[in-house]
A protein has these predicted regions:
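N-terminal leader/targeting and accessory segments in enzymes
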Residues: 1-99, 103
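Phosphate-binding loop of NTP-binding sites
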Residues: 27-28, 65-69, 78-154
Length: 154
């Protein structure tokens, strides 16, 4: 699947580690995008603005369903609940919802080992990475531990 097919306006929702990673990924792809966060205060707003010139930044009261419905795609960070009324209204209006892992799997052309479950994921992930490195393999470990998926080497 082409991550850009039919998408003209993107919004990165949630500006923690994963959201900023998604924004950097959009930059590397040459995509136009804006940024928003549900928090009423963003202590690093100036840093975000200067790092993503050409993108608009919305947060606090500016975060609304009307804002989100203006976009073709929302790249929603895992820390932002999809059950939020604003996001649910955007979904109802036909806005595509995706996340960093979806974008990663659409664009990654390297072998991937995905580890899921309730308990022990970080430990198993770390051990698998170390075993593969010990076997002489080129390995990048990331996702919800350490490096966000979209910041992993290509």
């Amino acid at each position: 699947m082409n991550a850009n097919k039919g998408i003209n306006k993107r919004m990165v929702v949630g500006l923690g580690m994963t959201g900023l990673s998604a924004a950097r990924w959009c930059q590397r792809q040459g995509y136009a995008f804006d940024l928003c966060d549900t928090r009423s205060e963003l202590k690093n707003a100036d840093v975000i603005r200067s790092g993503f010139i050409g993108s608009e930044l919305f947060y606090g009261e500016a975060f609304s369903a009307d804002l989100l419905k203006k976009y073709d795609q929302l790249i929603v960070s895992p820390g932002v609940a999809l059950a939020l009324p604003e996001i649910q209204q955007a979904i109802a209006a036909g806005v595509e919802i995706t996340g960093d892992i979806d974008l990663f799997k659409q664009t990654c052309n390297k072998p991937v080992i995905a580890i899921t479950g309730s308990n022990g994921k970080s430990t198993v992930t770390t051990l698998v990475g170390e075993l593969l490195q010990a076997a002489g393999k080129s390995v990048a470990v990331g996702g919800n531990i350490g490096v966000p998926a979209l910041d992993l080497p290509e």
